[in-house]
């Protein structure tokens, strides 16, 4: 099957789209990346999303409209990846769309029960592309008692398992998440959870203090010095004390967290603050390895992915934090994969599994009671593709 995976993450960089060919289904399926592209958000769209994410500034009218706007943007992004690959859109079998997370609440908070909301109307995508769309992947896992995250471990089992090596897959997107893929693989042996902020805090600090969307290659952070009192404040965040399975997001490490941090530590230089929150991401990752993984597994290889894997300062901090461990650290490209495309590929794989009526959550990662089939299916509007005017 030819499948397009569409991902818009917490970093708000844009829309990632991976066009892949998948042979078969289940953990033995074969996946080939044909083409990958990122379609950046225009400033107006990014501002609308940021407003929708803010409890103080959001409103239901905005979210309702944005749901349809994003659906159209996602559809256009699918058309773009097909155009760039010189691949006929009519030959596309399936689209897996994660959507844009507006709010994710994995645990009950007072009268608010566990819930999640991703938008980007699948009917718009299906209509514009005349292709079946699988969307809303997280809700069935939560219905089964899970946290709805992380969902990428199933795809990581397919793509990264190794006969002799115990591997850690560390994604550093807006949020960091890790998956343990043991060489002696069984579903229950796969551990996965969020490790805390990935790029989210760094990017927010960079935007506020330097008017830049991100710290390219970690060049600014490299000029600063880590401030211990600020790092201690960050490392005392309650999320780091929770046991897996667990997930987090902008609700805990977004604008409110950064506002509190900057107000509390105004006396320190901009460069030092950025260096410290970069170290916070590194230390939160290392903390979770030492607390929840390394006591149980001897790790041979740590494979970094996501935008944070291109931050040389962050990667060096991680290397220093894991220097005593006997494991190599590399990025996706070192083993023939793409850091940027990883999550979009994951949702193409999950869509393929849903199409074949296969469960694709990993209960040991999400905390769900059992394995379930993920996602909602939206069929194309035309029974005969020749009726479509596309």
UniProtKB/Swiss-Prot annotation:
- Domain of life of the organism encoding this protein: Bacteria
Its Enzyme Commission number(s) read 2.7.1.170
Q: Enumerate the InterPro entries for this protein.
A: Anhydro_N_Ac-Mur_kinase, ATPase_NBD
Species classification: Bacteria, Bacillati, Bacillota, Bacilli, Bacillales
The record's comment on protein family reads: Belongs to the anhydro-N-acetylmuramic acid kinase family.
Q: Which residues bind ATP per the record?
A: 9-16
Q: Which organism is it from?
A: Bacillus cereus (strain B4264)
**Protein name (Swiss-Prot/TrEMBL):** Anhydro-N-acetylmuramic acid kinase
Q: Which GO terms describe its molecular function?
A: ATP binding; kinase activity; phosphotransferase activity, alcohol group as acceptor
Please verify whether the record's keywords include Protease.
no
Q: Which reaction(s) does the protein catalyse, per the Swiss-Prot or TrEMBL entry?
A: 1,6-anhydro-N-acetyl-beta-muramate + ATP + H2O = N-acetyl-D-muramate 6-phosphate + ADP + H(+)
Sorted UniProt keywords: ATP-binding, Carbohydrate metabolism, Kinase, Nucleotide-binding, Transferase
State its role: Catalyzes the specific phosphorylation of 1,6-anhydro-N-acetylmuramic acid (anhMurNAc) with the simultaneous cleavage of the 1,6-anhydro ring, generating MurNAc-6-P. Is required for the utilization of anhMurNAc either imported from the medium or derived from its own cell wall murein, and thus plays a role in cell wall recycling.
Matching Gene3D superfamilies = 3.30.420.40
Q: Spell out the HAMAP family in the cross-references.
A: AnhMurNAc_kinase
Pathway, per Swiss-Prot/TrEMBL? Amino-sugar metabolism; 1,6-anhydro-N-acetylmuramate degradation; Cell wall biogenesis; peptidoglycan recycling
Identify the enzyme class.
transferase
Asked if the Swiss-Prot or TrEMBL record annotates the protein with the keyword Nucleotide-binding, the reply is yes
Q: Which NCBIfam families match?
A: PRK09585.2-1, PRK09585.3-2
> Which GO biological process entries does UniProt record here?
1,6-anhydro-N-acetyl-beta-muramic acid catabolic process; amino sugar metabolic process; peptidoglycan turnover
